[in-house]
Amino acid sequence: MGIKVYKPTTNGRRNMTSLDFAEITTSTPEKSLLVSLKSKAGRNNNGRITVRHQGGGHKRHYRLIDFKRNKDGVEAVVKTIEYDPNRTANIALVHYTDGVKAYIIAPKGLEVGQRIVSGPDADIKVGNALPLANIPVGTVVHNIELKPGKGGELVRAAGASAQVLGQEGKYVLVRLQSGEVRMILGTCRATIGTVGNEQQSLVNIGKAGRSRWKGIRPTVRGSVMNPNDHPHGGGEGKAPVGRKAPSTPWGKPALGLKTRNKKAKSDKLIVRRRNEK
């Protein structure tokens, strides 16, 4: 999918880019796989803001995605490649030979009319899903499960990929895009290939209104707030932070504070941390 560059007909259009959607084959989603999606605007069940800078934006329907890929031995034909407003990756509508329809994350190179299949005996071909133990070393994968049967949780964003490095007993070593090397159970499934729409990260939003269409609200600097709104607020003119280190709006240290649980059980499964050389 290429990048479309706009002419500077207005200030908002200057430097603006977008995807050309050349891979998208239809703009009409499969109705049976749509669910209504209520805008939460960053609020929890108590009505309190738990995620800032969210709200507004275009109304969306949620597309039910098959992250489990557990219909073993049943072939499916790719019918369409579609845009999904709820994620950076594109999605593909597949029709199984038993009549079931499903959406999957569209990997790079997947084409309409292509046949895909899941199961331990599936070929090592883009779009096929297999247990990690059955995938050869060096293969690039995405949509990786962390618990067998739960569905893919890792490597689902546009352009993301991971690589199978080897096998140790019942675990398989996988190198994630961050550089982290992690042990994952060999019975967990993964899909062959890289997630498509890899140029999505190169898009220049161009103007504030386009972020608002996506449901992203403005981010205000703490230094321009009042003291009752942020630890950096107050003072005369452009005042410094006034603290030993920058703080979050709730007074916790910002920039560099480690937030990972030191007793995380998954520590024993991480062979190399992402920030290790």
UniProtKB/Swiss-Prot annotation:
Biased composition (Basic and acidic residues): 264-277
Residue span of region Disordered: 219-277
Protein family (similarity comment): Belongs to the universal ribosomal protein uL2 family.
Listed NCBIfam families: rplB_bact
Function statement: One of the primary rRNA binding proteins. Required for association of the 30S and 50S subunits to form the 70S ribosome, for tRNA binding and peptide bond formation. It has been suggested to have peptidyltransferase activity; this is somewhat controversial. Makes several contacts with the 16S rRNA in the 70S ribosome.
SUPFAM superfamilies attached to this UniProt entry: Nucleic acid-binding proteins, Translation proteins SH3-like domain
Pfam families named among the record's database cross-references: Ribosomal_L2 (PF00181), Ribosomal_L2_C (PF03947)
Matches recorded under InterPro entries: NA-bd_OB-fold, Rib_uL2_dom2, Ribosomal_uL2, Ribosomal_uL2_bac/org-type, Ribosomal_uL2_C, Ribosomal_uL2_CS, Ribosomal_uL2_dom3, Ribosomal_uL2_RNA-bd_dom
Gene Ontology cellular component terms for the protein in this record: large ribosomal subunit
Keywords: Ribonucleoprotein, Ribosomal protein, RNA-binding, rRNA-binding
Complexes and interactors: Part of the 50S ribosomal subunit. Forms a bridge to the 30S subunit in the 70S ribosome.
Coiled coil feature spans: none
Biological source species: Streptococcus pyogenes serotype M1
Protein name (Swiss-Prot/TrEMBL): Large ribosomal subunit protein uL2
